[in-house]
C-alpha cells in the first residue's frame, strides 16, 4: 500500500473552493481506478495550504493515473487556485493503525 502525499499552497481564502471542487470531481475521477483505496483532504488555514493523502495499492497505478487526460483535466480545474506547483511524494505505508 502507498500514500501519495500532495501538498500545495493556495491563493488566500480559497481552501473551501478547492475542497468543493475535490468533493465534486474526485469520486468520478477515481471510480474506475481499481488500485485507488481512499483519500484524506486536510488544510492549514493559517498558511493557505492543503494536503491530500491518497491511498493506492501500488505506486505504479498512481503514476499511470497521473499521466491520464482525466487527471490532467481535473488538475487544470484546481490549478487556478494554486500559488505554485504542488509537491507530490509517494511513500510506502509501513504501518496502518
Residue positions per predicted region:
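Short S/T/G/P-rich N-terminal loop/turn motif that feeds into the first structured element of a domain
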Residues: 1-50, 55-69, 83-97
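Low-complexity, intrinsically disordered Gly/Pro/Thr-rich segments
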Residues: 73-77
